[in-house]
Amino acid sequence: MRDFLSRKSPIALAITIAATGAVGSLTIAPNAQAQESLIEEVVVTARKRQESLQDVPVAVTALTPNQLERGSIQRTTDIDKMVPNVELHQTYIGSESLSASIRGIGFDDIEKSLEPTVGVAVDGVFMASNSGAVFDMFDVESVEVLRGPQGTLFGRNTIGGVINVTRTKPTGEWGLKLQATFGDQDMTDVKGVLNMPLGQNGGVKLAFKNIQSDSHVYNTTLNGRRDFRDSTTLSASIRYDFTENTSVIFTYDDYDHDTIAPDNLMVGPFPEPLTGYLASQNDDYKTSPQLNPLEAYMWGDNSTLQITHNAAGHQFKYTMGIMDYEEEVHESSWGSSTVFFPVNRDQDFKQTSHELQISSDSDGPLNYVAGFYYLEADSFITSGPIQPFTVNHEAEAQAFYGEMTYDFNDNWSVTLGARYTDEDKNMQTYSWPPVVGDPDRIANNLDPAVLQMAATPEFSDDNLTYRAVIQRNFSKGMVYASYSTGFRSGGFFNRGTSPAEVEPYDSEEVDSIEIGLRSNPTENTQLNLTYFNSEYTDMQLPLITPASFPECGKGGAEEDAAGITCSFIANVGETSMDGLEVEGIWMPTSTLTLRAALGTLDASYDSYDYAGRDIANVAQLLYAPELTWSVGAEHISQMFGGELILTANYSFQDEVFTQTPWAIYDPATFPKITIDDWESLDISATYLRDTENGTFKVILYGTDVLEDGNRVQRRYTTGSFTWAELAPRQQFGITIGYEF
């Protein structure tokens, strides 16, 4: 057992499981039982149309509802346990905000003026911000994780990849699904879905979910645990088929997320010694002395309308999405046992998007998809009393896109695609001198007489992204080679409090090559391989400087000593990276499924220009693990008149670097800048019993069962102080469900 849990043995096992499928067809004739154990076909929409996963020349991993439930994939942030070269976490300082990195290209901030590197789409609607991108996996039909730039079909801000989530649709029949989960930290998670018919040609679906829990961090100052989460979502969806060729689906979501973030740890150096951090470290990070809580609230509603019409061998689709929500964040301790650097942030956000799409469904050699996309996103934020500012940010983008695939014969095909995007942004930002003390004084400080800065920067850009693929099919699968480009929008840094800090920066671009194999060597094996090589230019990188730095202009040595800094976003970097991804499935029998995934990544800065000085030899890419892997097994047996399904998944992620002011980084004086490598064993036992009245379900689960306590999941620095966020490790629970 010790060898199995070592770092090298599981890697060898992952490769062995995948390779067994490839070699098996060459050396061993599968037995009759294995012949019947066909791997279920998975249909994906990675190219904006329904296709078999094994036919798509894109690096995509698809997770089914059963995999999500039995694999303890409870929220968006758990997906990385089963997908190679993906790193996901929740950013607690923003409500339900997703920190996502795919193939070493990540985004870990909360500002609406900054663009993510990994896109998240729900029911065909692209989320313009990472706020709200951490959500529950209940009532989900499929999850697709597309790795690598997806600039042609998904557009801007997908240079790392896309997480594409599709929820279930109204069935048009009577149906009910109820589920309750109880777990550690007094967690209760209650969910339900009701389906009902709407006349002869339609259906209505009503859904609700509420989760409440206490913090996984014990507070040594309060001698207890804080409340952690109280989140409620209500959804209503209506589907109506006006004809056999025309269908309309409308979905409305109302949500209210109240989060008291798990207490952080002050890492240093200001304002206190590392006493609390060291004590927590010695106790498996179970404790924190944080005096005041980090409160994050988010409430609002989403609307989605989709109209589909089929005619003359084509599908015409219109998708509209509206997200309208408010956020509040309050923090004044940052993991410390004292009060300092109080921050209160109130923010409004609204996005509206429209997409018109036409796709062909021809038996002939040519198939295509084309469309028009429009997005408008507006936000307004007020922040203080330290570094008080207000920002109004507006963004507008439109794009035309198209992609066609031509089959020369049964073996060879080529795909060509392009997307033209035009966008405009503007920002009105005002800042005032810091107000220390009573937060109500902020109102008195919003006086033009004491205005510190007023700026109205503007940004416009257009970009052409494209993709070319050549594909060769064979009896057991296919191979492909692709070249694709993508870009991440330029813009402004809205936390800036000086004119230099809010100057516009340009868009970031990527060129990527992929070579892939998709194969089913036998009827009970599947082996997928992908090699990628990417070059990123004009990278948008953060620069944190002392106040005395010439480009900052906020003061001299006295201001430096007070911890005053400047924060910039600038196009100062170039990066190259390559890696390999392996995914394999083997079904030795009809009741046993083995899975494995492996991701390698070699990524480094080619250049990182800091005021004429190249710091590429010092700086490291954030959240870019060199190695990720997982192995899993699922066994199904008949027991007590029902099915018993045993599932286990063991995953590993290498160490990663965190946000650090690399230009002034000194290993002798700076706090630790890495997150240690970590592994997790998740297990579950699911019992299903079908009766004439429906299906009853009981799930016993454990996540990260081999490790007690918590672990550091993120480290953040402002230039003057650093704090760490803690993620839970070992958790146990039970789920009870019923559906018909």
Question: Model regions: which residues?
Answer:
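Acidic, small-polar-rich N-terminal luminal/periplasmic segments of exported/outer-membrane proteins
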Residues: 35-173, 515
